[in-house]
Amino acid sequence: IMGYGKIDPDIEADILTLKANPYPTYTFATHLVEIEIDEELGALELKRVWAAHDAGTIVNPMGTEGQIEGGVAQGLGQAVMEKVVRENGYVTNPHYRDYLLPGAKDVPLEIECILVGNYDHTGPYGAKGVAEVSLIPIPAAMAGAVTSASSIQPTHLPMESEYLLRLIERRDEEKL
């Protein structure tokens, strides 16, 4: 069996003003997280995630949920672990023994995927992409949860223990 398909998305670009709508469709997502922060150690743990995604027509619900769960794991890594260390223009942690990624113990057991299926006329069968968009909300949701839980406001990633401890110490000094 052989098939052929073509899509001609309605995208616009104005070369004079440099304004464009480069994508035929957009996926929307929002995440809510429950965290636990140990203020003595600066340890941050992601306990639960609620992930709502408008992915168009959901063609494969189990596959879609798997993509979202994988994105949550990637977002967790970006939020608290992944840090490129440079010295004199060279990366000094180019190996996985030095560049940390989340493992099975780090990812929360409870990830509730809320699939919103709004048909999209430009996607195949009305579907939209869901993979990468699922990692984007996690760092911001976790930073917001840290602020809500401890009255500190992280401003950069990753939110490592040492960094959170400095923020906690600064908060406590300001209270005196």
Where are these regions (language model features)?
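Cofactor-binding beta-sheet edge motifs in enzyme active sites
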Residues: 1-176
